[in-house]
Amino acid sequence: MQRLHQQRGDWPALIRLLPELRKDKVLPAAELAELERRAWGENLSLAAHQEADGTVGLQTLNRAWQQLSSAQRQEPQLVLAYAEQLRQLGAQVEAEEVLRTALKRNYDSHLARLYGLVRGSDPARQLQLAEGWLKEHPADPSLLLTLGRLCLQSSLWGKARDYLESSLRVQRNPEACAELARLLAQMGDTERSNQLFQEGLGLLDERLLAAPLPVPSHA
C-alpha cells in the first residue's frame, strides 16, 4: 500500500498510513524517517498548488505547514520545501523570515543557497546576516554563491564578483558560473563571460549524463 501511494503521488494518503508503518516496523527507522520527510515535503508542494477562493494556495500551504509537529518544522529538508513554495507563490518576505530563523537556529548549506534567491524586507540586513555566517563557514560554496547574489541585488558589483569567484574556487557549479557570467557580460568582459557560460552548460551536461535513465522496453 505504501509503494502504491508513492507511485500515485498520493502523499496525503501516505501520511495517514505513516503511524501504521511506524507501529508495524515495516521499514528500517532511517528509511521510514526519510519517507516521512519526503511525504510531508511533497504534501507542502501539493498544498501550494491548490486553489482556494480563487487564489493559489498560500493559505493552504500555511495550513499544511501548521499540520507538522514543532520538531518537523525545524527539519532543514522540510523548512527548505516550505520556504521554496513560499518563494514560488511570491511570499518573498515570509520566505526570508522562515529561512533566517532556521539558519540562526541550525546552519544548513541547502537553506543558505535558497537564502540568496529570496528578497526580504531589508536587503542590507540580509547581506549583513549572511556575511556573519561566513565567519564560521568560510568554505561553503553555497553560502559564497548566496553572498554573490545578495551583493548583486544591492548593486555591489565588485563584492559580488569576489564572492562568486570564491564560490567557484571551492566548487565548480553551474549556478555560480551563470551568475558570474551575467555579471561579467554587464561589466564588458565578454570573453570570460562566454567561457563561464560554456563551462556552466558543460557542468549541467555532466549532471544530466550522471542521471539514471529507464531501460528501453522491447516489443
Language model features with spans:
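Alpha-helical adaptor scaffolds
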Residues: 40, 44, 49, 97-169
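Register position in tetratricopeptide repeats
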Residues: 7, 88, 117, 121, ...
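TPR/TPR-like (Sel1-like) alpha-helical repeat modules
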Residues: 2-27, 96-109, 168-174, 182-209
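Alpha-solenoid helical repeat scaffolds
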Residues: 16-19, 62-66, 80, 100, ...
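"A position-specific structural signal for the A-helix of alpha-solenoid helical repeats
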Residues: 1, 35-38, 42, 81, ...
